[in-house]
Amino acid sequence: MKKIISVDGGKGGTGKSTVAAALIDVATTSAGMNTLVIEADTSNPDVAKTYNSAVETIAICLDTREGFLELASAVHKTTAEVIIINNPARSEKWLSYGDVFIDNLPRMDAQMRVLWVANRQKDSLELCKSFVEKFPAVPVTFCMNTYFGDAKKFEIWAQSKLRARVLENGGGELVFPDCADRVMHSMRNARLRWNQVESLDFGDLIEAERMRNECKALFEPFLQ
């Protein structure tokens, strides 16, 4: 059965593209999985621009019902083991049109889970709650992006009723590692994939290798 991982967060500025890129790297390299990337952030397609030469990538705008129908066709046709969707900031469209896609997952021979990339603000939880309430059968993994502070500082999440509900529904939580700003800046400017970090200065290289190894340990079990 195909695995769909929808990298979401409901808003901009939580690090969705960074998490999606790390997940794509683990899926295509250490996990060795046949992967399809859906770039739904069509206004700022950084992930597609970085990875389209290394992995099959399709740009689909999910602002309309037609976009979700196109997504369904792409998933139905693909022979990929895993489909990774990089959602835009405006991904509340899942609440409006996502049912036509999610209700037909069995016919696509696919199962879906959501990786909800969050900062420490309350609206990250509120947006996640809206998705969980709309689609209770879709497991959600709450991804604490430690760029915004270590996991202990995600107190709103830790003390929330939503956390208990997510775990009861078969979801989970992950702590995504932070990487030095200078490394991320260099990689973004040069559009480097994680398997191309050898071109970085030595100090940046060893930091990128640390980050990549931590993401491997984090995401390999998640992809199983």
Q: Which residues are covered by each model-predicted region?
A:
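Conserved beta-strand segments of the P-loop GTPase G domain that flank and frequently precede/overlap
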Residues: 38, 84-87, 113-119, 141-146
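Short acidic, S/G/P-rich loop/turn micro-motifs used as interaction or catalytic elements
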Residues: 14, 89-94, 120-124, 148-150
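Conserved C-terminal guanine-recognition region of P-loop GTPase G domains, centered on the G4
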Residues: 102-106, 122-142
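Switch II (G3) loop of P-loop NTPases
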Residues: 81-98
